[in-house]
Amino acid sequence: MITLPEQLEKLSKQENLIAQGAESLVYSAQHPYLPQQECIVKYRPKKPYRLPELDAQLSKHRTLAEARVLQKLALGDVEVPHLVFIDAKNGLIYMEKIEGLSVKQWIWNEEGDTEGGAQEAGDKSRSLPDGDVSSLKDTLVLVGQEIGKLHKSDIVHGDLTTSNVMLRDGKPVIIDFGLASVSTLAEDKAVDLYVMERAVLSTHPVHSQQYCDWLFEGYLAVVGKSQKEVMRKLEDVRQRGRKRSMLG
């Protein structure tokens, strides 16, 4: 059973748990300083299988690391949720609530696939309506640009998917930096791009190649020749992925 810190236990009785992952619980709660606004509270619960001292140390370290990443990116003009408050001892991060759809859901809406994932990868007969193409391209190019700014800041997300990019007033905001790390390595950034590429293939199979082309168009417009090594490494990562698929 998950034991919540006292302040979060009070919130959880009246507010909503909106997401639950392997490492954290995410709540929508009242903003601590602006009562008329909501914010997001991310909580890393205790792991009963760890030694308590080690668990507390890891939770504090990861909470502080995520907060530092958010602060670094905000200062670097990358669109991410603004930090509101952190309680590293209890594994809590309060941050801005981004109002809008995930890019995944937005694409499904644009495709007319409200159930999500209903299209099959082999169904090539379904083309995008003319009016949607411009909107899809413009938005995915913007997403690629935001990823480019992320990597130029030497931050690797660790779980780049269309679920972890929100659209606020049509502009992308990258969320969920629980697996993020600082890295200057082209290999790490290439793996980040590969994860996004595979996510697009999985959740938007019919037009995945076109969507990825637009993402990379935006990415390269930001990083330019400075990240040419990243794209070369991406091809290496793809080849390793194909080999693993063949070997099962």
Curated annotation (Swiss-Prot):
Coiled coil: none annotated. ATP binds at residues 18-26, 42. Keywords: Activator, ATP-binding, Chromosome, Cytoplasm, Hydrolase, Kinase, Nucleotide-binding, Nucleus, Phosphoprotein, Serine/threonine-protein kinase, Telomere, Transcription, Transcription regulation, Transferase, tRNA processing. GO terms for cellular component: chromosome, telomeric region; cytosol; EKC/KEOPS complex; nucleus. Residues 113-132 are annotated as: Disordered. Its EC number is 3.6.-.-, 2.7.11.1. Belongs to the protein kinase superfamily. BUD32 family. This is EKC/KEOPS complex subunit BUD32. It comes from Yarrowia lipolytica (strain CLIB 122 / E 150). The gene is BUD32.
